[in-house]
């Protein structure tokens, strides 16, 4: 104990000495050679400083975006889902519907899916729980993805700042909504995502990717927009054409829900084909449920939940031994 006290005292003394030295020799003041003169109007709105790329009066409509965040020459795609899509492969997202336990999430993320469809539209967990799951196994085989609840700045930026590499946005009904979702997904100049930090920038997540996260994420993010309503069907061509939309999801359940027709009926299939036609014309990837993996032109899928995966796994493991429990005549287990 006495030794620890002496060590602590020595550290304090060294700290005080360093502080005293700094006060005796203060650092030179920071220089701002292009700053406006104190208390004066610099006229910056009307005229740029010497050497500026953007000349003339300030106008956002004609602003030439700078090169500070360009990806380095020769940068390669590091998101395996984006790469597989670009190569023409089929990608599948396994759904984590209700789990908040990182161990369950990581088991799903290493089970063989391309990405994890973390469900936030129909689940009440918070973003803190999601961020904790994602940072537990960031280098799992399946990259973190999420279906957000709606297309707004707060929802999508929570997802991205936590490390999402696949963003699924539901119920896109118009070109304006498609652009809104795109804007919050991408950094400028394509979008309006704020550069505010978050665990996505950490070295334990994507901070160490080749070329830098801020510089390369626009080329690596996957944005999937869902058409689920009659209004969305009417605007399908315009939705699919929005730059930055990677794929369009034909929502098998809600297109039935909003149309009033069951899968297989002519009216239902017409709705699905409207999404198909718009997506193919736009040169985008077409997504649907895993049951449609053999349907023409569908190359992106949502698979079942972690609960369904557990049930399937147990059934496969037990085989003929499944559901062969003894049946007591009495007690709580009597049937």
Language model: regions and residue ranges:
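Positively charged n-region of N-terminal signal peptides that target proteins for export
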Residues: 1-4
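Bacterial N-terminal signal peptides
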Residues: 7-16
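Expand to "…catalyze enediolate/carbanion chemistry for C-C bond making/breaking, isomerization
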Residues: 21-335
């Amino acid at each position: 104990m006495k030794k620890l006290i002496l060590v602590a005292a020595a550290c304090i003394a060294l700290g005080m000495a360093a502080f005293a030295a700094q006060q005796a020799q203060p650092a030179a003041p920071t220089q701002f050679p292009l700053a406006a003169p104190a208390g004066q109007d610099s006229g910056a709105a009307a005229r740029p400083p010497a050497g500026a790329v953007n000349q003339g009066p300030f106008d956002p409509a004609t602003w030439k975006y700078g090169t500070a965040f360009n990806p380095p020459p020769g940068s390669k795609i590091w998101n395996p889902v984006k790469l597989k899509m670009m190569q023409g492969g089929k990608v599948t997202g396994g759904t984590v519907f209700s789990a908040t336990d990182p161990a369950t999430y990581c088991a799903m993320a290493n089970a063989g899916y391309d990405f994890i469809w973390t469900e936030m539209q129909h689940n009440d967990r918070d973003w803190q729980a999601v961020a904790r799951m994602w940072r537990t196994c960031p280098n799992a085989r399946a990259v973190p993805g999420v279906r957000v609840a709606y297309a707004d700045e707060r929802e999508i930026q929570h997802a991205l700042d936590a490390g999402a590499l696949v963003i699924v946005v539901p119920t896109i009904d118009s070109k304006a909504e498609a652009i809104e979702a795109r804007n919050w997904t991408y950094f400028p100049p394509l979008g309006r995502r704020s550069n505010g930090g978050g665990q996505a920038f950490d070295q334990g997540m994507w901070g160490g990717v080749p070329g830098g996260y801020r510089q390369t994420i626009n080329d690596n993010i996957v944005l999937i927009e869902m058409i689920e309503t009659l209004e969305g069907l009417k605007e399908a061509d315009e939705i699919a054409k929005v730059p930055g939309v990677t794929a369009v999801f034909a929502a098998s359940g809600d297109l039935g829900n909003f149309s009033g027709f069951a899968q297989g009926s002519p009216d239902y299939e017409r709705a699905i084909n409207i999404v198909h036609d718009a997506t193919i014309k736009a040169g985008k990837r077409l997504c649907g449920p895993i049951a449609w993996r053999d349907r023409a032109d569908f190359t992106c899928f949502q698979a079942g939940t972690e609960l369904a995966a557990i049930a399937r796994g147990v059934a496969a493991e037990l085989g003929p031994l499944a559901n062969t429990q003894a049946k007591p005549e009495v007690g709580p287990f009597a049937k």
